[in-house]
From Swiss-Prot:
This is Elongation factor P 1. Gene3D superfamilies: 2.30.30.30, Nucleic acid-binding proteins. One of its GO terms (biological process) is peptide biosynthetic process. GO terms for cellular component: cytoplasm. One of its GO terms (molecular function) is translation elongation factor activity. Involved in peptide bond synthesis. Stimulates efficient translation and peptide-bond synthesis on native or reconstituted 70S ribosomes in vitro. Probably functions indirectly by altering the affinity of the ribosome for aminoacyl-tRNA, thus increasing their reactivity as acceptors for peptidyl transferase. It comes from Mesorhizobium japonicum (strain LMG 29417 / CECT 9101 / MAFF 303099) (Mesorhizobium loti (strain MAFF 303099)). Belongs to the elongation factor P family.
């Protein structure tokens, strides 16, 4: 752990604040006409996801946390647990489905993920930014709606609904952004 000044906090930094671990989502340096400058920081709690806005003056110091990043391979799902394997030591890690959240639906056998660890305890997980999935259902194209960019709903193999362009049909493979849960492009 390293101490840093409040004005050195940048987006992506993980800090210890009020007894919890927080990641800086957004920062903004404010220089008011009267008084000293400060750093307005939007923080997100790594454990429960709550958000908090804090002001840090340059004279304040905070603990910057160094997270260990480990690569894991997704193995299988068992009840409410997701099982991953460390690619270095072959040890298995079991995480609750709630820990991964809605993005658990994107996990596929053998998919590589990065788990963020603090003192050997998992506190976050990063999935690949894009995955390739097959469309199981797509509404038919309605003729005459081509004047404006129109999208139609489609259901993916994992049950997630996304909006796709009219030329995409059932059975096609598309690339989906796992962060925004949006259509990116047709897969090759």
């Amino acid at each position: 752990m390293a101490k840093i000044n409040g004005n050195e906090i940048r987006p992506g930094y993980v800090i210890e604040h009020d007894g919890g671990l927080w990641v800086a989502v957004r920062t903004n340096t404010v220089k008011p006409g009267k008084g000293g400058a400060y750093n307005q920081v939007e923080l997100k709690n790594l454990i429960n996801g709550t958000k908090l806005n804090e002001r840090f003056r340059s004279a304040e110091t905070v603990e910057q946390i160094r997270l260990d990043l480990k690569d894991f391979s997704f193995l299988y799902e068992q009840d409410d647990a997701l099982v991953f394997m460390d690619t270095q030591s072959y040890e298995q890690l079991e995480l609750n489905k709630d820990f991964v959240g809605d993005r658990a639906a994107f996990l596929q056998d053998g998919m590589m993920v990065t788990v963020q660890l603090y003192e050997e305890r998992p506190i976050g997980i990063s999935l690949p930014d894009q995955v390739t999935l097959t469309i199981t259902e797509a509404d038919p194209v309605v003729k005459g709606q081509t004047a404006a960019a129109s999208y139609k709903p489609a259901v993916l193999k994992n049950g997630i609904r996304v909006l796709v362009p009219p030329f995409i049909g059932a059975g096609e493979r598309i690339i989906v952004d796992t962060n925004e849960i949006t259509y990116v492009r047709r897969a090759d």
